[in-house]
Amino acid sequence: MEPWIPQWLPQPSGRPPAPSKDPDRGLWKDRYYQPIPHSWHNGERVHQRQDVGRSPQPQQDPREDLQEPHYAARSGEWRPPVSGVDYYEGGYPSQLYSRWSIEDLYQSYYSPALREEYAYGSYYYHGHPQQLQEERVPRQGSPYIWQEDHRDQKYLNDHQHENQNSPFGTNRETQLQSKSRNPYKDSPASNSGQERPEDLFMESPLTGAQKNKLSLMEESNLLWQHESGLTSSSYELSQYMADASELCDPMTSAVWSPVQAEDISAAGPKEPMKFYVPHMPVSFGPGGQLVCVSPSSPSDGQTALVELHSMEVILNDSEEQEEMRTFSGPLIREDVHKVDIMTFCQQKAAQSHKSETPGSRDSALLWQLLVLLCRQNGSMVGSDIAELLMQDWKKLEKYKRQPPVANLINLTDEDWPVLSSGTRDLLTGEILPSVETPAQILEKFTKLLYYGRKKEALEWAMKNHLWGHALFLASKMDPRTHSRVMSGFTSTLALNDPLQTLFQLMSGRIPQAATCCGDKQWGDWRPHLAVILSNQGGDPELYQRTIVAMGDTLAGKGLVEAAHFCYLMAHVPFGYYTVKTDYLALLGSSHSQEFLKSATTEAIQRTEIFEYCQMLGRPKSFIPSFQVYKLLYASRLADYGLTSQALHYCEPVGTALLSHGESSHPVLLVELIKLAERLKLSDPLVLERRRHRGDRDLEPDWCVHLRGHHRELQQKEAGDIGRPQSAQAVISEARKTPENTFYQDLSGPQGNSEAYGDRSALWPTLEQSGPAQLSPQQPRSYPTGGGSGQMGVPVPLYSVPETHLLGTSGSMAVTGAPGGTAWEEAQQIHLPPVSPETLQHPDGQKAISRPQVPLIPRARSISESSIVSVKEDEEEPPRRQIKIFLKYRPERKPEREGDTKSSGFGWFSWFRSKPTHNASPSGEEDSSDSPDSEEMPRAASLPQPSPSLSLTPSPDPQSLLGASAFSRDTGGDEVRGSVSGVGTAEGPGSGGLSGPEGVSTELCLNAGVLLPPPSVKGSVPLYNPSQVPQLSTVTSLNRPNRLAQRRYPTQS
């Protein structure tokens, strides 16, 4: 018997069990099964019919979904008889039926312990009961809890429709009466589709031959066990393990179940449970706490137990927390004494010396450098660093001279002869020992000089190693000879000799040690760097490039600490982790590896100490790229339960961000505010204030400053996009710094027509500006620093404000949509809007009314500035106009030659004319003075002016020609605003315009074109821009008008 099968009460061996009183249950009669009736929808009891003398009818296998014949036992097969023990004790043979029928046995029975029942997935199905509740012994915690009244009624009532529609409803009893499993359902015979005769229940009375075969079934099962290689004990163990695996696999049971999922009893749970075993949910709190919720049963009235654990206590023995606790951070200049930092660095250096890792010596050197910097308040001197490099240098290495190589001078491998070498015998070829003493060598050198043989004497001195005499003699000769002698002298030194490095550096080239250090054959890199730092002179850039090259070579060899030491000596700034081309991001850690391996705790602490040493000499010398690592270190402190220290780390980061002002990173600022918000209750001062004041929103002062700075950045960003600003403040700021407004990054919203509503406060109205009294003869003055304007570069007076449409009494169709190109160009200029005017083409075509957009201020020369007053720009900013929409007008060639010629010399004739302050009273006289006045329509009277700027066009197209930037109100006669010409405005009741109002407004199209002077009778006009169509209609802000520069040369 398998351990998971329900145990049956043993029956007395002397008598058979009493038959059940239930009429619907099948009875044992001569060890045959009676067919169990099924209830159909009409209430009749239908027995499945099967001919005893013939083969069973084909039935559908529930596992294969195919129609296979239910065949009787073959003649060659042997079935063991059912033993008496199985008959009397169990009531049914234990190994007679399929294992899958056991699953069908308990289909309609569920346990009140729904959690335990559902933990086995879809294993429990509805089935037909085969034993009474009192006839079995239930196990402790078993899901099989039988109910007597549920045995027949539940089966017949709940599954009436299912038995009707099931393809094997007539042979249902063959799948519901078995209690045992077939241990060989996964055997090769079962997998090949061959079913054993005993796998399916024999529903009709069996024949005599079948009785005999059934009696031999037990023997056949033992034979199968022997063939499969399983003993009885291992067979039972394998069955138990297989059954246990199937209990946790709901998909397997669902495949073989003839009962659909919707027919399962509604008492069971409908949704799958997330966990099959009891568990404990945990969560990490912001204050370094671990919150645990113990498992409970709310249905039984148990309340959940919430436990709070401190991460500082849990991780008290961890190495990472110990490393953070011993470091006295954050390192603030006013709170931490440098003696504590020096002690910490010395301990770290001693630990690095004890470890025998490859980079331990270089790591100890970095810690010793930090000690020296902390002692000297961040200052570095070359001789002090050289002493640090050579302090553990026990003895000088004996640098061996390398074998000679072919040089570019003599192209031979011959080396300079040594002192002990003698002359070679011509007969024998042997080298005779030299008998010359140093005195004799010097005497021969002197004799050669007696006779004026300088070259021979130089060669003799070089061969006999009289390098002092040779160098002095060569210095008085030609430079080529001196260079050759120096090369010969340095060639006698070893390549890895520090003297070779120094001499090469003094010769003005990067030493070979800078590109070869780090190899074992080359030797140590420290003496070379020491001799470079101690003898700095000449070209500082050459020395810096040499040290950086040495650092790059060491970094390529994997010596990161040594490379960073060189970078610090070359004053290389710290970079960012994401920029792989930067030299260093954290001191002693390579940023070319993974971030978690790069941003180690030791590297962050080492970099913070270096920043602290710099602040000892310069208080505000923060490392901008290091602030994000401080925030990361504060987060790690909070994770390890050190919340108070983490909150203290946020304060210097916030101080550094506030000191940088607008150059700070907004994302880092937001993350810092979030972390400080979570940790603010770790500050005891804040807790004390909350108790006394009762203010729950109280936070540290530096947090308040951070939030205010964040709001300022947001407001500035909103202002750049389209936030309304005061025009007067913008104009005054632009006048103070005209050279800076040109390089501002101007951006504004495009395509949002609703944003340009009634913003009358954005630009000053005409009442504020008043009628402008222009004096053309007043000399023009430029602000300081306006050299760019004199060179012809247009400098806008207004930097940020965008153009908008003011509310008008009428309506007007704007030619350019807000999302169009013309509107975008107008938005980039950011000049005040003015009223619309009409544009007159040169050929006299029909005037087209177009909305005016702000004018780009043009550049003026000194000659022009001597005549025109600066008040023109200061008092009448709305007067200037630019015609962006003329950009799409095709260019036209001049019709007459004389027009072009006269316009080219118009500026000279303008100088000869002497305009007066008096303007002509009407536009008729003004237009008569111009030779081209026939082509220009006269200005008509304007409507009544309104207090504010208006975009309402006049019904008469002729009245729009030459219109100024003002209109007439219906209730008053006073003219307000500024005239677009250079004349003065008329008084009340004036019906005409003064000055060159009749002149075509295309004069204002280009920023580099002069404004027309006041038209006086008898004066010569400047020129007509309509006659010069080759001029660019729109001048870019980034490029001056070259034609204007050639026509109006500047004077220095």
UniProtKB/Swiss-Prot annotation:
GO CC entries: endoplasmic reticulum exit site; endoplasmic reticulum membrane; ER to Golgi transport vesicle membrane; Golgi membrane
Q: Where is the composition biased (Polar residues)?
A: 163-181, 739-753, 766-781, 1024-1039
- Region annotated Central conserved domain (CCD) sits at 271-718
- Where is composition skewed (Acidic residues) in this entry? 923-934
Locations of Low complexity compositional bias?
902-911, 941-961
Provide the topology term for how it sits in the membrane. Peripheral membrane protein
Q: Which residues carry this modification: Phosphoserine?
A: S55, S75, S142, S166, S187, S190, S253, S257, S863, S866, S869
Keyword entries, A-Z = Endoplasmic reticulum, ER-Golgi transport, Golgi apparatus, Membrane, Peroxisome biogenesis, Phosphoprotein, Protein transport, Transport
Q: Name one GO biological process term.
A: protein localization to endoplasmic reticulum exit site
Q: Where is the signal peptide?
A: none
Q: Indicate, by first and last residue, each region the UniProt record lists as having compositional bias (Gly residues).
A: 984-995
Q: Does the keyword Membrane apply?
A: yes
Compositional bias (Basic and acidic residues): 21-32, 41-52, 891-900
Q: One Pfam family name from the record?
A: Sec16
The compartments listed are: Endoplasmic reticulum membrane; Golgi apparatus membrane
**Keyword Electron transport carried by entry:** no
Region Disordered, annotated ranges: 1-85, 159-198, 735-794, 836-857, 891-999, 1014-1052
- Primary site of residence: endoplasmic reticulum
Q: What does this protein do?
A: Plays a role in the organization of the endoplasmic reticulum exit sites (ERES), also known as transitional endoplasmic reticulum (tER). Required for secretory cargo traffic from the endoplasmic reticulum to the Golgi apparatus. Involved in peroxisome biogenesis. Regulates the transport of peroxisomal biogenesis factors PEX3 and PEX16 from the ER to peroxisomes.
According to the record's subunit comment, the protein's assembly and interactions are: SEC16A and SEC16B are each present in multiple copies in a heteromeric complex. Interacts with TFG. Interacts with SEC13.
The UniProt entry, under PANTHER family, shows: PROTEIN TRANSPORT PROTEIN SEC16B, RGPR-RELATED
Family of the protein in this entry = Belongs to the SEC16 family.
This chain's protein is named Protein transport protein Sec16B
Q: Which organism is it from?
A: Bos taurus
Q: What broad taxonomic lineage does this protein's source fall under?
A: Eukaryota, Metazoa, Chordata, Craniata, Vertebrata
Corresponding gene? Answer: SEC16B
